[in-house]
Every structure is written in structure tokens, then in C-alpha cells.
UniProtKB/Swiss-Prot annotation:
Pfam families: PEPCK_ATP (PF01293). Keywords: ATP-binding, Cytoplasm, Decarboxylase, Gluconeogenesis, Lyase, Manganese, Metal-binding, Nucleotide-binding. Substrate binds at R64, Y206, K212, R332. GO terms for biological process: gluconeogenesis. Disulfide bonds: none annotated. InterPro entries: PEP_carboxykinase_ATP, PEP_carboxykinase_C, PEP_carboxykinase_N, PEPCK_ATP_CS. PANTHER family: PHOSPHOENOLPYRUVATE CARBOXYKINASE (ATP), PHOSPHOENOLPYRUVATE CARBOXYKINASE ATP. Pathway: Carbohydrate biosynthesis; gluconeogenesis. It catalyses: oxaloacetate + ATP = phosphoenolpyruvate + ADP + CO2. SUPFAM superfamilies: PEP carboxykinase N-terminal domain, PEP carboxykinase-like. This is Phosphoenolpyruvate carboxykinase (ATP). Involved in the gluconeogenesis. Catalyzes the conversion of oxaloacetate (OAA) to phosphoenolpyruvate (PEP) through direct phosphoryl transfer between the nucleoside triphosphate and OAA.
Amino acid sequence: MQINGITPQALAAYGIHDVRDIVYNPSYELLFKEERSPTLQGYERGIETQLGAVAVDTGIFTGRSPKDKYIVRDDVTRDTVWWSDQGKGKNDNHPLSQETWTHLKELVTTQLSGKRLFIIDAFCGANPDSRLSVRFVTEVAWQAHFVKNMFIRPSDEELEGFEPDFIVMNGAKCTNPNWQEQGLNSENFVAFNLTERIQLIGGTWYGGEMKKGMFSIMNYLLPLKGIASMHCSANVGEKGDVAVFFGLSGTGKTTLSTDPKRQLIGDDEHGWDDDGVFNFEGGCYAKTIKLSKEAEPDIFGAIKRDALLENVTVLADGAVDFNDGSKTENTRVSYPIYHIHNIVKPVSKAGHATKVILLTADAFGVLPPVSRLTSDQTQYHFLSGFTAKLAGTERGVTEPTPTFSACFGAAFLMLHPTQYAEVLVKRMKASGAQAYLVNTGWNGSGKRISIKDTRGIIDAILNGSIDDAEMQTLPVFDLAIPTSLPGVNPDILDPRDTYASIEQWQEKADDLAQRFITNFDKYTDAPAGAALVKAGPKR
């Protein structure tokens, strides 16, 4: 048995033996048939919806499991990885011994041995010079469908000489019975070995572990080569001008980068090298909770045959209730990027970025709707990765909840955050890019900044009119803010003007400034971080 050069002997090199059959890079048509097979049970089986997409259930894991993430600590990683047990910063890069890795690998390979396997060969990264050739091995048809959607699909010619740089073995059906004596978090695991170039998955069925696993690997490899690795969306204008949008969930990253006047490069993961900005992925992984055709026509229209829904409620007639979050608020859909019409073709890459937009949704009502950042301020706010959620009514919570996530993606960083900031600013200086902090949150009026005003701000950034505006300095945070912008309500540009008195703003600003200062202390164990303290707020 040999399929595209994959033989039982090749799989034996990974530790997988006695394979019954190999389904290699199956077509969407075959996957559609396989994942709905009446012989499948439990989480393996998908169901067809009225929209044409197949829906699956990922079990108790409806999101990533960061506490179960491990990296083998060896000569390759010992002095490069940002470890959870070293330094000031708390992170999810938990060290794993070679001995425990060997045991976990045996668990997964035993699970996959003797089975009918689906193998997907794909690329991570649209630039051939820095892309990873990744081989995914799974016994579950819909997991093969997920990675076919999310990663870059090679041509037949590219598959002929395909040599994997990295192997992902998904043994979702197996768990680790020895986790306690090994000092691990639970019986489930997502483990990486940078020397063997392998990712192992056990116990969790969540598809995003494969997507974000490879993002984490790119986040390790690329910055060490001087290439920026970014958790951002990106688009390009008619004149070839590229903008990247950083932001945590709920800040408007997807909404604001989706613009009828600009083509989408990608919605989530990008690199920036000597040639420009490029997508890591060949698909999109969009949230679907409360999705409607009216509010998000592009995403809604992408949910059709070949798309894969996760953890949504499917009614008896096959209709999807996107408003039902009873299983999870993190309902998702994956689909190939060409399901979105206004995209960069044929390859998801463009030139160098000239605008870098850091999005925040400040529920404290302190930050201005837009400010122009210096190079040091860019690094400071990039490392801070701030956003905040409105206070809930439960348990008497009366103040907003701040979130600080390094580089707007702390969960996926394998190196110290300052390394990502340094590489980003180096790329920005080389291209003459300017950064802006855009607040899509609230102000002193208690109302959220309108999408109309925010879009006006984004337009002013992209067309350059903000750089011609008269600027003033906002105290405490020392931010340069425009006094007026075309199409934007001038009364909101200085957040102090939205309060009954400047003293009210000052009190809140001092409080938020202290939160920034306290958070940023964890980066001061690196010289680059300590040097940036002066670019932050002052009390």
C-alpha cells in the first residue's frame, strides 16, 4: 500500500503501525460523505445542516485547553522558550521532560495504530521561503476536514515532492492515565517537541488546537529569523497599501478589517518578512454566536457546503440556531478563505504594511478613540495588549474587567513577548509604517463609540488625513490625539470632553494607568521591556 509516497513504513517512522488504510488528502466530496457516515458514533459523526455545511460536536472541550499545553525542554528550547516557571510573566508554556514526552507519544501512536487514517499534507504560511510543510494524521474525518479548510492547500505538483517539516498527530480518543504521577495538569494534553518537530494531541476534540498549535510553532520559528509573527487581521487597498489590525476578541478586528473598498489578506494569523505581509492560513475560523445575515453577510454567506460548524445547535429539520449559546458562547465555523469574495488572489499575501492599528475596547472610558503612537509607545501598547469588558451584574461586580494579553495573543507566544515587539518595530521602521491606538469601547457618556465614528477614524488612518490633523497631547498616557477628523464627531476625540468634569476623567485615568504599570512590570525582567517603561502612562 502506497499513496503519494506515504507507506506503512513511512508511518512506522512516526511510531504508527499496522495501518488498515490511508485516506490521503481527500476531496471535500469524500470528506462530506465520510464525516456523515451512519456507522460513526459520538463526536466523530457530523450532521448536514440546511445551509449545506456539516456540524460537529467537540465534546467537553469547546475551546483550547491552555493549562494542558506542554513543550519539551531540551537543548533546542531551554534558552529560547518563554517558560511558565521562569521570569516574572505567567504563561502557558509548561515544560515537559523527554521521558514524559516519550510516554505521551506512545499513547497517541498506539491510538492511531491499526486504524484507518486520514492524512492531510498542507502548508502553514503563504510565502514559500518561510512556510512550514505540515502533515496532519488523524482517525477522524471531520478533523481532516478542519485542517483542509484552515491551512493552505498544496497543488498536485506541490504534493508530489511534499516533505513535512512538522507532524501533527491527533489522538483525540486517547487520554493519559499517568498524568498525576507525571506532574501534569490533567489526563488531556497538547504537547510540542521542537527537536522532533511533532505536535501530539490527546483527550481534546477541539479543532482549534491544530490551528493554534501551528500558529504557536510559527511564533517560535519566525521571529528567530527576523520575521514578524502576528495575531492580527490584514487587508490591502486599491493602491497596494497594506494595513494590519491587532486586537483581542470583541474589539472589532474582524469587522473593521472587512471593508468593501479593500481586499482581505487574512483574518487572524500573519507574518511580515522582506517581501511583505502574508497569511499563515488558507481559511477562516469565525465565531458564530448570534450570527445574522444582516449583521455579518460575508461570514453568513461563507457557511455553505465545505464549511464546518462546531458546537452550534442544529434543530430537527437541519436549521441552525445561531442564537443558542447553551453549549458554549464559542460556537465556530471553519471555511476555506475563497468562501469570502473580496480577498487577495491567488495567494494571500501583499506588500509591506504602512499602517498598524492596535484595537482596544476600553470599558473604563479613559482612552481616546484614536491616538498616533511613537515607536516606543507602539511597543509598549503592543506588549500590554489591553482591552476591557463592561461590568456584569452578577455578584455585585461594579467595575469593568481589564484584560492584558501580550502582543494581543499571549496564549500563542513561545518566545519572550519583547522579541515580538522588537521584530515588529524593526519591520515598521523599514517600511515607514505608522501605528495608531484605536479605542472602539466606551467614553464618559456611558455609550460605546459608534461604529460610524470608528469607521470614520479607520478611513482617516488609511487615507492619511489623520496625519494632517492638528494634534494635542492627552495627559497621563501622553498620547497624541487629533482635534478633528473628517466624518468623526469632534466632541468625542478628547475623552475628557465626554465627562461632566475633567476631574472625573483624571480619577479614572489614574486608576487605569496604575493597572497598566502593574501589568507591565512582568516585562521588566528583559532589558528591552525595562527600557519601554517610560513610554507608558505616568501617575
